[in-house]
Amino acid sequence: MRVRGALQAAALLASALWASPLLAKDHPDFKTTKLDTQPNNLNYFQGSDTILFHDPHKANLWRSDDAGATWSVVKDIPDGKVARLYMHDFDPKRAFAITDGRKHYRTTDQGKTWKKFEINAEWDTERYDILHFHATDPDRIIFNGLNCLGFLCEEVSLYTIDGFDTPAKPLRPDTLGCWWAKSNALFTTGDSDLDKDRILCIIMGVDSIFTEDRRLVISDDFFKADKEGNIQEFEPNLAGDKPVRGVVNVAAVKRYFMVATTSANTDEMALFISTDTKKWQRAMFPNAHDDHDHKIVQEAYTVLESTNYSIQLNVMTGSKSQPMGIMFTSNYDGTYFTENLEYTNLNMYGHVDFEKIAGIQGIFLVNKVDNGKDVDEKPSTKKKLVSEITFDDGRTFEKVTADGKRIHLHSVTELNNVGRVFSSPAPGLVMANGNTGDYLEDYWDANLYVSDDAGKTWKKALKGPHKYEFGDQGSILVAVRDSKEEDVSEISYSLDHGENWVEEKLPDDLKIQPWILTTTPDSTTLQFVLIGKAKGAWQVIHIDFEALHEATCKDSDMEEWHARVDKDGESTCIMGHTQTFPRRKKDAKCFLKKEFKLAEVETKDCDCTDQDYECDYSFERNDKGNCVSKGPIPIPEGACKDGDKNGKFMGTSGYRKIPGNTCKDTKDTKDKYKDVERSCGDGIGAPPEEATGELQQVDTKGKFGHWTQWEKHYLERGESSSDSSETIIMRGKNRTVDDSGPKAGPIWRTTDHGKTWEKIDFFKDEEVISIVPHPTVKDWVFFLTEGKKLIYTPDRGKRFRTFDVPQPADLEAAANGIFPLIFHPDKPNWLIWLGKKCESKNDCYRVAYGTKDGERWETLARDVYRCEFTGAEAYGRKYANRALEQILCLKHEKEGASDSALQLVSSNDWFNKDEKVRLKDAKEFATMAEFIVVATEDTEKKTLRAHASLDGGLYSEAKFPFGFEVPHQHAYTVLDSSTHAVNLFVATKMEGDKSLGTILKSNSNGTSYVVSVKNVNCDQYFYVDFEKMVGLEGVALVNVVANPDAKSSAPQKLQTKITHNDGAQWAYLPTPSKDEFGRFPCSSSGTEKCALHIQGYTQRRDRGKTYSSEGAVGVMFGWGNVGDSLGPLKDADTFMTTDAGITWKRVKKGRWNWALGDQGSIIVMVPIRGQKTDTLEYSLDQGATWKKHTFSKEKVDIWDLTTTRSGNSQNFLIWGENSDGLFTTKIDFTKFTDHVCKYDPENLGKSDYQIFSPKHPLQPDGCLFGHVSQYLRKKPGLKCFNDFRLDPLYSKQNCTCTRSDFECDFNYELDNHGQCALVKGLKPQDPKLWCKEHPDEIEYYEPTGYRRIPLTTCQGGADFEKQAAVHPCPGHEDDFERKHRISGIAIFFAVVLPVAAASAIGWWVYRNWDGKFGQIRLGEQGASTMEFFDADRPWVKYPVIALSAVVALAGAMPLVLAAIWRTAKNTAQRFGVGGGGRGGWSRLDGGGASRTFRTRDSFARGRGDYTIVDEDEGELLGEESDEEV
């Protein structure tokens, strides 16, 4: 078997030139070449006898120009330099030898000569498409590589239009791969100029390294920049009218361009198709069946060998350990797919048992899993594979038979050769290894079978499995027995289509273990190459059958072979036409000897019949064979535009002609399959019902029973989700102190946001102690039991699967925050399980196990405290040593000694061979964005030390600022940080619930810190009064202790402060204006004596709630009061802001719960729990006006008000209790809208959106962190709704750099004039450290006292870091001298011209000055050379320090997945209080548990807000608040 083409497992070999036979022989000629190492990546130059292969061990290239008879090492390339060989995809004379450096080699004459060329980048060992070729111009090539500085790497793309005759040029920054639009000869944009130049690139998101923010851009002039520096490019509207984020892959398939996208919260991918790169459409798949899904998930789809007229796709279903799939075929446009076959067989690499019969249209072989449903339900079930064949491109399938018996064939998933698996261009000739019987058996029990009618009938050829090839267009078949040993001494060949076989001994009594048997890709020659292993060496055996026959075939030796015939032998139709090939007769004694020329096919179209049609999109065949509707159907463009659901359009009959079928329409088929009249209401994207303004509600009462709390989990959708459902999984629970009474009720599921609820019967006999949604892929939910069984759903509760973990969970550790199940941020199947293993009753320890599929578990480490995945695709691309598989563990130094000190160990290979101790005396660690922060203990001083790492390997100790004295550091809390710096809270005063501390801000590598804000309030568990405004950069609230030095008996005086520039300055909140509820006790713009103060995180009962929503940018709510300090919680009112905290208003007297929907255009409020009500209030204009709605006939106690965390839904859910027990009420606002909002940048008056740009009250230019951000906000009062895939961030424009973009450097602090001055008694940090940390840099600057804020994106302007003297780095003095050498012309421009200009200006001033020296006019400001540094200027008065904000939706990586256990809210012993819909937690223990980490909001986008690292005793936290939810 062989895999040629798509799999690219190895390239193909060629054969020798024909020569006129001088003398007939009765055996082939052999020539043998012995090699020390295994040949790799053998490639023929198309249409020739020239072969190349790569020797990876000695890093050389070998070449043969006589079909493998003789070989020599390529001499033009230095010995030992070749790392990879690439053949040009479209030029049969070109190849490229890539080295490990930046100097590479190319040939344009089939390897005779090689020329060196240089690329200003290194090759990326992890990607295959390093070189991307233009389909029609062989000189146009894109190089996708890397630029690395130490362990920091960035991807780059360069291009050449002259085949590297001149140096390649970079395309644009931040690329993740680029492709020519003309990547396939069949593809065209419809414009020859665009075909020539158009390039598509995947680029990084704006200030983001995360996959879900990546974008696709297109350029037609190589991404050139204009005079202002703007790159000439555009984002294509993949979604029809708007671009789509999260682009992960681009592929050119025949006449189609395919783009795959992903998004947060789901592993589903969206597939967009274009036939010209101008107009794009999302690929549509039919509705899912009951037993399998139709969505495309990450790493779970394979583009099969498609045709010129459709795309064939296999979508994986089932588990990774036992993968299966569904095969689909698209329509002509590639947008609507129909199902061909379910339960196709594939392996864990995505290879599918599928192959087309070469050269014949519509025929392919597949293997399917006959017991697929059983395997899907229980992945440990062994697959039973059967083989089938289709002759109508997948519309129908038949059994494969030999002599009347069914046979099954080994296919692509069991490769044992190179090239195509079954067939070759030899017309109708097919070979395969297989067996008779019910199912496919072991490969080594197979026999060789042959078919000469394109797979219709088969016959047994040779006993045992073989490697095989075709020659001379099928005139000769060659096979060699496959073996596990070096015991093969002969080959077999047949000259009559496999009827008879001749054995031929290998020369010199040679015995080999065969590796590959191959010939030219077109199978037109008589020369073959056999490679095998013998006695520790590799034998390359050239086999030449040229002289077996003297004759060259004549016309009388040829026959017309029809691809398909009827019972009378007459040609019948395949795909609407007959196919006839000229072929040598089976018994003819001759060879064709037509080297590199394929047989020409003759086709003739047939009249259409029913067999030429298949079910169209959204239709399936019923039991009678008719195509019936299974879902909405496509509406033609331009139809149903008037919004009338009862309107009509001409739509599909339910049938379509099979794509690629060329049959001629007849009158009968035209009438039978013509379009029919359809109702607009039945179509995809049917017009919605007219907006009536009616508020709908659905009550669910009396079915949930009596419980003391809810446990509920919203399963958020991703932007790439095709499913529009709003799924919630929930159950009632009792918060019991002892074991009396039931702990939890049945598990319920809704897919329509609470309109209907179904009880999940799967759990009828299961005792689930914890429900845990996957933190980054919300389609997956895990259900933990007390034993070894773990239950999960990969599709939001549609199906459930189980697997066993190696050991039960350590429930005691789980109650203390060590969650047993750890997830990988990118790979939902990758899990770590912390199990409790006991040698005896009193001898138990924790073991970490790892799996990639839930079926096979391996021991990672013993005696561990906890482990975490720290590898991620986003960070692995940036930090070379941070592998995707990287795992960190806290592990006891001595196995078996649980009282021994912990050490931080890491592994980049699941602890197979790589295990390194990184830090000793480790106490805890946390991951936050790209940073890994670790606390270690100084055992002598009994204090903690903080360390940080970017790559998981190198850890540097944190340097705290001078004057920040904490004699004994006992607790750190990692706050929600930006993606470029660490926010670290350090407790400075620990007095129970009167504790406080300082927030410190790091530099870009997490090691050097400056003070951001002091005296920040925290509680005894080191939760901090810190609240970030979700979705905005740099806006955060803190509560500070105004009387930090007061006696412990005195009450704390808390005051709220806000930052709009990431901690550069903090200000009090302004008081609202007088409102309908009366006056406030004072009024001001925000002063120490009078301001608005908001209750902080430590006062919050439900710590899963947030004050803002990621979808409603700039909107925030809070409970608080006006005065000189924060008052009691019971006296608080409800306030809100719509402009990111610049102004506030009171919306309700007293405390109300709120929820935001439709990206903030809908606000719903209800009284808090304990205040019975029958009414809710809502606003459709961001709180300007409010309306009431009575939702209940009786007053009820509302426990919670929820909607989706993203804030994109128009539905809300009230959770409460009435006389019948627990109830839910769905509040539905969909009747208020009837179409999707549109943004029209050309006509803002007609646009449904207005632009909101966050401002800083003291920075009028609007620049925050070096840029101006603009967000879309729906105009009030419109009857449109926001698409849930809408990205609120509309644009971001960089500003020039000013003082605001720099903060004080290490050992510098702000003086009284607002300047960064050196701290008295200290020295600046040694600037030579810059050279040490950046070995490729040639120079360093003396310290200026300033450093660039990590978050800023400013460009140009002032650079405060580089305004002092510059010096060469050690070892780079010559480079420095060359860079700074001054020429004579430079001296002229630098000295002579300025002096002359100064003289001229002085003369002009003397003549025109209208005042005298010393005169100052009223109303004028005196000029000063230091005016820029004037202390009153905002950029001087408020230097940016940058706190903890993140770009909208960036969040932070999961900090400590121990927190997920707390998210579960329950253990077998005790259950806590239910959480909220905006990220509410479930946890194992209701109270009394000592916990190591604190983290909240850790499941938003898979990243958390903050985590405590450690406290004095090694367990940071004390008793947990009973009020925590």
From Swiss-Prot:
<keyword id="KW-0653">Protein transport</keyword>
<keyword id="KW-1133">Transmembrane helix</keyword>
<dbReference type="GO" id="GO:0016020">
    <property type="term" value="C:membrane"/>
</dbReference>
<feature type="glycosylation site" description="N-linked (GlcNAc...) asparagine">
    <location>
        <position position="734"/>
    </location>
</feature>
<feature type="transmembrane region" description="Helical">
    <location>
        <begin position="1385"/>
        <end position="1405"/>
    </location>
</feature>
<comment type="function">
    <text>Functions as a sorting receptor in the Golgi compartment required for the intracellular sorting and delivery of soluble vacuolar proteins, like carboxypeptidase Y (CPY) and proteinase A. Executes multiple rounds of sorting by cycling between the late Golgi and a prevacuolar endosome-like compartment.</text>
</comment>
<feature type="topological domain" description="Cytoplasmic">
    <location>
        <begin position="1406"/>
        <end position="1439"/>
    </location>
</feature>
<comment type="similarity">
    <text>Belongs to the VPS10-related sortilin family.</text>
</comment>
<feature type="signal peptide">
    <location>
        <begin position="1"/>
        <end position="24"/>
    </location>
</feature>
<keyword id="KW-0813">Transport</keyword>
<feature type="repeat" description="BNR 3">
    <location>
        <begin position="449"/>
        <end position="460"/>
    </location>
</feature>
<feature type="transmembrane region" description="Helical">
    <location>
        <begin position="1440"/>
        <end position="1460"/>
    </location>
</feature>
<keyword id="KW-0325">Glycoprotein</keyword>
<keyword id="KW-0812">Transmembrane</keyword>
<feature type="repeat" description="BNR 2">
    <location>
        <begin position="105"/>
        <end position="116"/>
    </location>
</feature>
<dbReference type="Pfam" id="PF15901">
    <property type="entry name" value="Sortilin_C"/>
</dbReference>
<dbReference type="GO" id="GO:0006896">
    <property type="term" value="P:Golgi to vacuole transport"/>
</dbReference>
<protein>
    <recommendedName>
        <fullName>Vacuolar protein sorting/targeting protein 10</fullName>
    </recommendedName>
</protein>
<dbReference type="InterPro" id="IPR031778">
    <property type="entry name" value="Sortilin_N"/>
</dbReference>
<feature type="topological domain" description="Lumenal">
    <location>
        <begin position="1461"/>
        <end position="1525"/>
    </location>
</feature>
<dbReference type="InterPro" id="IPR050310">
    <property type="entry name" value="VPS10-sortilin"/>
</dbReference>
<dbReference type="InterPro" id="IPR031777">
    <property type="entry name" value="Sortilin_C"/>
</dbReference>
<dbReference type="GO" id="GO:0005829">
    <property type="term" value="C:cytosol"/>
</dbReference>
<dbReference type="GO" id="GO:0006895">
    <property type="term" value="P:Golgi to endosome transport"/>
</dbReference>
<feature type="repeat" description="BNR 4">
    <location>
        <begin position="493"/>
        <end position="502"/>
    </location>
</feature>
<feature type="topological domain" description="Lumenal">
    <location>
        <begin position="25"/>
        <end position="1384"/>
    </location>
</feature>
<dbReference type="Pfam" id="PF15902">
    <property type="entry name" value="Sortilin-Vps10"/>
</dbReference>
<feature type="repeat" description="BNR 1">
    <location>
        <begin position="62"/>
        <end position="72"/>
    </location>
</feature>
<keyword id="KW-0675">Receptor</keyword>
<keyword id="KW-0333">Golgi apparatus</keyword>
<feature type="glycosylation site" description="N-linked (GlcNAc...) asparagine">
    <location>
        <position position="1005"/>
    </location>
</feature>
<feature type="repeat" description="BNR 6">
    <location>
        <begin position="1135"/>
        <end position="1145"/>
    </location>
</feature>
<keyword id="KW-0677">Repeat</keyword>
<dbReference type="InterPro" id="IPR006581">
    <property type="entry name" value="VPS10"/>
</dbReference>
<feature type="glycosylation site" description="N-linked (GlcNAc...) asparagine">
    <location>
        <position position="1294"/>
    </location>
</feature>
<dbReference type="GO" id="GO:0005794">
    <property type="term" value="C:Golgi apparatus"/>
</dbReference>
<dbReference type="GO" id="GO:0006623">
    <property type="term" value="P:protein targeting to vacuole"/>
</dbReference>
<keyword id="KW-0472">Membrane</keyword>
<dbReference type="InterPro" id="IPR015943">
    <property type="entry name" value="WD40/YVTN_repeat-like_dom_sf"/>
</dbReference>
<feature type="repeat" description="BNR 5">
    <location>
        <begin position="748"/>
        <end position="759"/>
    </location>
</feature>
<keyword id="KW-0732">Signal</keyword>
<feature type="glycosylation site" description="N-linked (GlcNAc...) asparagine">
    <location>
        <position position="308"/>
    </location>
</feature>
